[in-house]
Amino acid sequence: MARIAGVNIPTAKRVVIALTYIHGIGTKFAHEIVEKVGIPTDRRVHQLTDAEVLQIRETIDRDYQVEGDLRRETSMNIKRLMDLGCYRGLRHRRGLPVRGQRTHTNARTRKGPAKAIAGKKK
C-alpha cells in the first residue's frame, strides 16, 4: 500500500480513484495531479514506481491543502463565524441547518434524533 499525505492508498484501484481517498482531493484534483505528474489515467497504484509515488506526494504537498491542514482551516472558519456572532455562526452554535433549509419538519440529521414530547392529556 502506498502512503500519500498520511493516508494508505488502496493498491488495486486506479490512481485517479485511489487519490480521492485523501480528504480534500476529489475527482477533479485527482485528474489534475495525474496530469501534472504525467501518469496514464488507467494505471493502477500497485504499478506505480517509487519515483512516481514520490512525485505525486511532492505535488500534493506543494500545490494542495489536504487532510489535517484542510480540516483545521475548516474548523477555524466555523469557529470564526461563531465568535463573530453572525447568523451563520449562531446556526452552527445551535446545531441547526446553516444554509436556509426549513427546520419545521425536516433537518433531523443536523438536529439529531427526535426528542419525545409529552402529548396533551385528554
From Swiss-Prot:
Disulfides per UniProt: none
UniProt keyword terms in alphabetical order: Ribonucleoprotein, Ribosomal protein, RNA-binding, rRNA-binding, tRNA-binding
Entry GO CC: cytosol; small ribosomal subunit
GO BP terms, alphabetized: translation
Gene Ontology MF term list: rRNA binding; structural constituent of ribosome; tRNA binding
Region ranges (Disordered): 99-122
Alphabetized InterPro entries for the sequence: Rbsml_uS13_C, Ribosomal_uS13, Ribosomal_uS13-like_H2TH, Ribosomal_uS13_bac-type, Ribosomal_uS13_CS
SUPFAM superfamilies in UniProt: S13-like H2TH domain
Family from the record: Belongs to the universal ribosomal protein uS13 family.
PANTHER family: 30S RIBOSOMAL PROTEIN S13/40S RIBOSOMAL PROTEIN S18, SMALL RIBOSOMAL SUBUNIT PROTEIN US13M
Quaternary structure, from the entry: Part of the 30S ribosomal subunit. Forms a loose heterodimer with protein S19. Forms two bridges to the 50S subunit in the 70S ribosome.
Role noted for this protein: Located at the top of the head of the 30S subunit, it contacts several helices of the 16S rRNA. In the 70S ribosome it contacts the 23S rRNA (bridge B1a) and protein L5 of the 50S subunit (bridge B1b), connecting the 2 subunits; these bridges are implicated in subunit movement. Contacts the tRNAs in the A and P-sites.
Name used for this protein in its record: Small ribosomal subunit protein uS13
Organism classification: Bacteria, Pseudomonadati, Pseudomonadota, Alphaproteobacteria, Hyphomicrobiales
